[in-house]
């Protein structure tokens, strides 16, 4: 049985999700700090697949790590990284069973 190819996030998609998330949370300090840092993080799952034997959770983990480590947004970096990781998993048919509030709380370091 063949598996579906992984759908990777685009730069434009991440920007839209970041802005929508920050507005929904009532944040006023958000936006792009460095586009190259976003694109670098978005490339990590592709590299993990090309140069290793990364399954979907491993690709998601490297995406999340890259987004948090790179700190590419003005604000909301951990929340956006957690949200985008969840989105990445969902668009590829994998759902996290934790409540969204628990995911955000865990992802924001609280």
Region locations from a protein language model:
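FIC/Doc superfamily catalytic core
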Residues: 1-110
């Amino acid at each position: 049985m063949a598996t579906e190819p992984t759908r990777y996030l685009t730069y434009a998609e991440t920007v839209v999700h970041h802005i929508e998330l920050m507005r929904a949370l009532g944040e006023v300090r958000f936006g792009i700090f460095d586009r190259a840092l976003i694109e670098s993080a978005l490339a990590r799952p592709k590299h993990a697949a090309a140069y290793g034997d990364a399954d979907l959770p491993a690709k998601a983990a490297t995406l999340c790590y890259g987004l948090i480590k790179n700190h590419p947004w003005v604000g909301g970096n951990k929340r956006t990284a957690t949200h985008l990781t969840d989105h990445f998993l969902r668009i590829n048919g994998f759902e996290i069973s934790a409540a969204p509030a628990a995911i955000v709380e865990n992802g924001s370091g609280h």
